[in-house]
């Protein structure tokens, strides 16, 4: 409970979410599109790219943020479409919260799709952010942490992935957002965080305070989950 209180205090404007309404992942993504389209200054989570909308589909404006794909082409030689589209990323990956449920042990994400507890976590709007598809793919279900050196694989986007170690290092500007999201998910759903995670996230939360967009985004997410 102390982590939930800490997260709520840091967020300042995020109302307590106590009801048990379940929103499917597909519906949650549609709600997030509405929230982000309502803010003309909204940008992608990791690279801070402006978002160009065509209907409900978003595309990252790479020129606005200096993002360049790690892979322009796929292994088959085709254009890397995921580098040109917005995807809705779980800040705390589905693997991290799903693997703490029995259904995951019985058959992974597919088995958990039928379980209310998993569906509720999967569709929680507070845990969803718009990311360049390539980064969503590269981050996979890797844990967040610090990576030695500054290997820039995505142009000016300060997002690093250590594939062998299965670790991703996000930009400083969103580390607090990540910390508050993890603490929220842990307390809202009774999920376990390691001692190392709590310590690291605590540092991130203090070094990156709540910004105006968080104050606007989180109440909107809460309202969308209630209505």
Give the label of every model feature segment.
Residues 1-7:
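Sec-dependent signal peptide recognition
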Residues 19-85, 201-203, 216-220:
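Aromatic-lined ligand-binding clefts that engage carbohydrates, nucleic acids, or primary amines
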Residues 63, 69-227:
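Domain-level detector of nuclease and nuclease-like folds
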């Amino acid at each position: 409970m102390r982590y939930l209180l800490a997260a709520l205090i840091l967020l300042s404007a995020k109302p307590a979410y106590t009801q048990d309404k379940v929103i499917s992942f597909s519906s949650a993504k549609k709600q997030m599109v509405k929230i982000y389209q309502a803010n003309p200054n909204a940008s992608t989570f990791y690279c801070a790219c402006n978002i160009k909308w065509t209907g409900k589909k978003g595309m990252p404006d790479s020129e606005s943020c200096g993002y360049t794909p790690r892979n322009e082409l796929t292994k088959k030689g085709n254009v890397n479409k995921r580098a040109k589209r917005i995807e809705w990323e779980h800040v705390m990956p589905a693997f991290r919260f799903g693997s703490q449920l029995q259904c995951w042990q019985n058959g992974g994400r597919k088995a958990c799709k039928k379980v209310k507890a998993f569906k509720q976590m999967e569709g929680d709007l507070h845990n969803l952010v718009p990311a360049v598809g390539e980064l969503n793919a590269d981050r996979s279900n890797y844990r967040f942490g610090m990576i030695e050196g500054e290997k820039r694989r995505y142009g000016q986007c300060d997002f690093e992935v250590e594939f062998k170690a299965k670790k991703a290092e996000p930009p400083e500007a969103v580390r607090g957002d990540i910390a508050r999201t993890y603490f929220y998910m842990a307390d809202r759903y009774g999920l376990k965080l390691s001692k190392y995670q709590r310590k690291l996230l605590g540092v991130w939360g203090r070094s990156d305070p709540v910004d105006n967009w968080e104050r606007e985004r989180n109440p909107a997410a809460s309202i969308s989950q209630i209505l």
